[in-house]
Design a protein with these regions (language model features):
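His/Asp/Glu-rich, glycine-adjacent segments
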Residues: 75, 83-263, 272-279, 403
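A long, amphipathic alpha-helix that forms part
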Residues: 28, 235-261, 274-315, 494
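Substrate-binding rim/cap in mid-to-C-terminal beta-strand-loop elements of soluble/periplasmic
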Residues: 345-386, 456-498, 514-518
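Second-shell loop/turn segments in exported
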Residues: 25-31, 54-57, 108-114, 232-239, ...
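Loop/turn elements at helix/coil->beta-strand transitions in domains of secreted/extracellular proteins
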Residues: 12-17, 47-51, 78, 131-136, ...
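Secreted, luminal/periplasmic, and some membrane-associated catalytic domains
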Residues: 62, 85-110, 119, 124, ...
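Bacterial Sec-dependent N-terminal signal peptides
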Residues: 1-12
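Short, structured active-site-proximal loop/turn typified by the sulfatase FGly-forming signature C/S-X-P-X-R
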Residues: 29-78, 135-139
């Protein structure tokens, strides 16, 4: 036997802590590295088995699809979570991927469950292996990251409600620990402290020197008024949310008896490292530098608390990001380098007119456009006894004539296996039960304008986001690995260390650095 990064007789960890940072950027860790202390990001990078980058094998990544992929070890084509929302054309409205009318919320009005995720998660398999004895919990800013990282069989998943700022959950999960109840209603609750919370620079302004593009010398200052509708959604995009996550996570470490059972326990924690919602149209800000600086301190506090309560030697730490980054930066006047505007509503209207010219005007042949996909009126096509594949192909040929369209893929082509290196990302990132009839890929620099003054325009950028992956604790020796690994390899690696089956849709092998090679 050749032992790689593990001790020869490595024990199963008593606790698994999955730390996922929404919108984490590896390049920002590098840019801001000199402002960090020794026991946060630097501790992870120096004491862990560090993979330079993980790759998600599909396009249009968002929070829901990223978290489902990381925790199931499979892509959306299997786990079914293609995005945070989908469009219900029958009722003409957006619907959360988590929506489930059969369950009500605790400390929230939302009706959520994980039932639309078709694959099992790491936590589900741990529950099955332990016959329910392991405790599995998740804490996150948003319901998507909380519920999808917890899974179907978890004890509980908690997120901050957008309306009241309390830690919310769904009655799908039976566990509501007393200390969460006490926290929500006590002097430590967010509402009790909100008036005193002001976000200003933590460091002197000259220390925020990673970007030479900040033009003003005015320190930022943000306050939060509970009476405004966007109070908590905005707060959830500041460093305060990570401190709130830590406050609750420390309650779980203190009272949850993690690591004391005969079977391992699991705690999934999500932090936020994206732009502030109030200035989404700006990049290269002092705010993002301050977010990382404060997150470094929060990581230090959390890792130290785990070490003190359970011991890092008894804990497997899994640290990574969500593989995407949201920016609404707009081009200054006169600086639009290439591209133009793509108007989905006009596209749908013209396509419908084209199909009416061919197949008649007795019906509307197109339902609508959502998330770069066009949905045809399949009932009308079936009633007219027309061939769906032929109509999809004709529609695709017509759409390719539009300015700004790079490629159009049909649902039939993906179902029939007619994909190539360029279109496999559409097959991986969509699910056959939810996919549109046509998937449109626009050229970089083009702007999607939905002709809705309430919506921001979306500028197409095809940049990859560097997303590190770190395994630390539990006898793992420090090493840096510079090959790219797949996001679907994370879950089977964690289950391998736990000595349990991988999630049921996971087809990847565990990373070989964490296995014993014969």
């Amino acid at each position: 036997l050749v032992v790689t990064n593990l001790e020869a007789q490595q024990r199963t960890p008593k606790l698994v802590v999955c730390i996922t940072v929404d919108q984490l950027r590896g390049d920002y860790i590098e840019y801001f590295y000199n402002t960090f202390g020794e026991r946060g990001f630097k501790r992870l990078m120096n004491e862990g088995l560090v993979y330079n980058n993980i790759k998600f094998e599909f396009s249009d990544i968002d929070q829901a699809s990223a978290f489902a992929t990381l925790f199931t070890g499979s892509n959306p084509c299997f786990h079914g979570v293609t995005g945070s929302k989908y469009y219900d054309f029958e009722n003409d409205k957006e619907v959360s991927i988590l929506y489930d009318k059969d369950y009500i919320g605790n400390y929230t009005r939302e009706n959520y469950s994980p039932k639309k995720m078709f694959s099992s998660t790491i936590g589900d398999e741990l529950k099955i292996a332990s016959k329910g004895r392991s405790d599995v919990y998740a804490i996150a800013p948003d319901a998507e990251s909380a519920i999808l990282s917890a899974g179907h069989a978890a004890n509980g998943a908690f997120w901050m409600d957008d309306m009241n700022g309390k830690w919310a959950t769904t009655t799908y999960y039976k566990g509501l620990p007393w200390y969460v109840d006490r926290y929500n209603n006590g002097v430590e609750s967010l509402s009790a402290r909100l008036e005193q919370m002001v976000w200003t620079p933590t460091l002197p302004l000259d220390k925020y020197n990673a970007f030479p593009y900040v033009l003003d010398d005015i320190p930022f200052k943000y306050t939060f008024n509970e009476k405004t509708n966007d109070c908590f959604p905005k707060l959830k995009t500041t460093p305060f949310i990570n401190k709130e996550i830590n406050r609750l996570a420390l309650q779980f470490l203190e009272y949850g008896a993690f690591g004391t059972r005969s079977c391992p326990d699991m705690l999934s924690v999500t932090y936020y490292a994206g732009n502030y919602k109030g200035i989404m149209n700006k990049d290269y800000t002092r705010e993002i530098q301050d977010t990382y600086y404060q997150l470094d301190k929060d990581l230090e506090q959390f890792l130290d608390a785990i070490d003190k309560k359970v011991g890092l030697a008894n804990t497997l730490i899994v640290f990574t990001g969500s593989g995407y980054y949201t920016s609404e930066e707009e081009y200054a006047d006169g600086l639009l380098i290439n591209g133009g505007e793509f108007h989905p509503k006009r596209c749908v209207a013209l396509l419908n007119m084209y199909l009416m010219a061919i197949y008649g005007q007795q019906s509307s042949w197109v339902k609508g456009f959502y998330n770069n996909q066009i949905y045809l009126n399949r009932k009308a096509i079936e009633d007219a006894k027309l061939d769906l594949r032929t109509i999809q192909d004709k529609a695709a040929e017509f759409l390719m004539e539009f300015s700004g369209v790079q490629h159009v893929t049909t649902d039939h082509a993906l179902l029939a296996g007619e994909w190539n290196e360029g279109t496999v990302k559409f097959r991986q990132g969509t699910h056959h039960l939810k996919r549109g009839d046509l998937i449109i890929e626009l050229q970089p620099g083009w702007i999607i304008n939905n002709d809705n003054p309430k919506e921001k325009v979306k500028i197409i950028r095809n940049n990859a986001v560097i997303t590190p992956l770190v395994f630390m604790g539990n006898g793992i020796k420090p090493e840096h690995i510079y090959r790219e690994v797949k996001a679907t390899e994370v879950a089977p690696t964690v289950t391998h260390v736990l000595r349990i089956r991988p999630p049921n849709a996971s087809q990847s092998l565990p990373l070989w650095e964490l296995t014993i090679k014969k």
